[in-house]
């Protein structure tokens, strides 16, 4: 009854108005699963490759009809009749069918859509919520949200080089409370930005994108918003940064246009980040060095790795082979988990498990181009990842994940826990 009997792929639009892939999987029992894949703006060089049409006459070349065609033909034929309850076998079939390391032949967007939709169909047939289907019946932790309130870099048109400045409600006692704190700070920040005569327009991920003089001015604005919302910076709400450093790393230098064109070596940039961490309650830095600057990553880890979460995104691209190398070299202490960087759920879960075994944290993440699909919320709870990064407190594509987490916490009731600072077990 779990046999796959139909697969339907289609082209839909993401939160930026760009095409992406959606997939429906129908089982013999009548159960159905639907999933849509996200897409990133700043992407790592080693990510699995999404297949785009390149036809400039449609969607500026960003159409995904080729990926959809692959889904409706070759992928459909390979998965037809397989047991949807056997996720690992389904994903292995997809990986072998594509036959490339980067999933470029059939497209990571096509493979991931199938992988996710199969899981949703199997959960539907089992009568289970997706997080229970993935994670079993044991106690589960709700994730600490890393809420992007000020955007810069590739996610906004302003003076900031760093891509995200985030708030982390580590002092809350439940996810529901953490979400409320974040929303209240978001609205306090909006009022402050408006009061200073700056635009309150939001970036791709729902955060504001004000033209502040420099990064410290942005940090200070957030701290003021936290205080005005009635919370204590640090003990109740900490800060996080996503530098996306590969975006401004050229010829061995980190050039910060938002800091007056400052050009820094890896050590100098590490020193700057360390200075900010000493001055402000920053407990997490993502992509603090460029993806190819492994020496810089080692410097940063040696300097800050005991007191700040150092998250590898472009560095690791949710890939166990690269993560293993990072663990062996003592680089970073956390991995960002993006399902479309690797292309199947099985490989995603393997990366989370490898990180945990090594004492690294795993932060489940959205992409800048999102949909109403909320699978990552279920993954964060099912794997006890304890941290999620899914944007600001605006835009329905971001709220879809937060609202799903509210539902999950309600369903789990007393068996749900909110870890707060304990989510950062890599800093013990």
UniProtKB/Swiss-Prot annotation:
- Pathway(s): Carbohydrate degradation; glycolysis; pyruvate from D-glyceraldehyde 3-phosphate: step 4/5
Q: Which PANTHER family match?
A: ENOLASE (PTHR11902:SF1)
The record's annotation in Pfam families points to:
Enolase_C (PF00113), Enolase_N (PF03952)
Annotated positions binding Mg(2+): 242, 286, 313
By what name is this protein known? Enolase
Active-site residue list: 205, 338
Species for this entry:
Bordetella petrii (strain ATCC BAA-461 / DSM 12804 / CCUG 43448)
Origin organism lineage: Bacteria, Pseudomonadati, Pseudomonadota, Betaproteobacteria, Burkholderiales
Signal sequence interval, chain numbering:
none
The cellular location(s) given in this protein's UniProt record come to: Cytoplasm; Secreted; Cell surface
């Amino acid at each position: 009854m779990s046999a796959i009997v139909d697969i339907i792929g289609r082209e839909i639009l993401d939160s930026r108005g760009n095409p992406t892939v959606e997939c429906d999987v129908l089982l013999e029992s009548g159960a159905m699963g639907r999933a849509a894949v996200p897409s990133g703006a700043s992407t790592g060089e080693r990510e699995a490759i999404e297949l785009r049409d390149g036809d400039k006459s449609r969607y500026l070349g960003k159409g995904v009809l080729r990926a959809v065609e692959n889904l409706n033909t070759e992928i459909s034929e390979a998965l037809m009749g397989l047991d949807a309850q056997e996720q690992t076998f389904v994903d292995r079939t997809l990986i072998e069918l594509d036959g490339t390391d980067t999933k470029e032949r059939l497209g990571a967007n096509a493979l991931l859509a199938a992988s996710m939709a199969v899981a949703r169909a199997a959960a539907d047939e089992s009568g289970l919520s997706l997080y229970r289907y993935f994670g079993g019946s044991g106690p589960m932790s709700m994730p600490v949200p890393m809420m992007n309130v000020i955007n810069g870099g590739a996610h906004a048109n302003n003076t900031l080089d760093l891509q995200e400045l985030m708030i982390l409600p580590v002092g809350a006692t439940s996810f529901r409370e953490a979400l409320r704190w974040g929303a209240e700070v978001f609205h306090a920040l909006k009022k402050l930005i408006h009061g200073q005569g700056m635009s309150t327009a939001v970036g791709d991920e729902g955060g504001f994108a004000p033209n502040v003089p420099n990064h410290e001015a942005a940090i200070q604005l957030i701290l003021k918003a936290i205080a005005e919302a009635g919370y204590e910076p640090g003990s109740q709400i900490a800060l996080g940064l996503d530098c996306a450093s590969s975006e401004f790393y050229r010829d061995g230098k980190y050039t910060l246009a938002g800091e007056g064109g400052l050009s820094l070596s890896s050590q100098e940039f590490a020193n700057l980040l360390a200075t900010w961490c000493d001055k402000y309650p920053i407990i997490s830095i993502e992509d603090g060095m460029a993806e190819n600057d492994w020496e810089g990553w080692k410097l940063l880890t040696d300097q800050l790795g005991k007191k700040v979460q150092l998250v590898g995104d472009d560095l690791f691209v949710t890939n166990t082979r690269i993560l293993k190398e990072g663990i062996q070299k003592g680089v970073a202490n956390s991995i960002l988990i993006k399902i479309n960087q690797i292309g199947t759920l099985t490989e995603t879960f393997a990366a989370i498990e490898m990180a945990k075994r090594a004492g690294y944290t795993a932060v489940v993440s959205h992409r800048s181009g999102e949909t109403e699909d909320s699978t990552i919320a279920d993954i964060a709870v099912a794997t006890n990842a304890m941290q999620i990064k899914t944007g600001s407190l605006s835009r329905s594509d971001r709220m879809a994940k937060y609202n799903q987490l509210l539902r999950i916490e309600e369903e789990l009731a007393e068996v749900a826990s909110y870890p707060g600072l304990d989510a950062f077990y890599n800093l013990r």
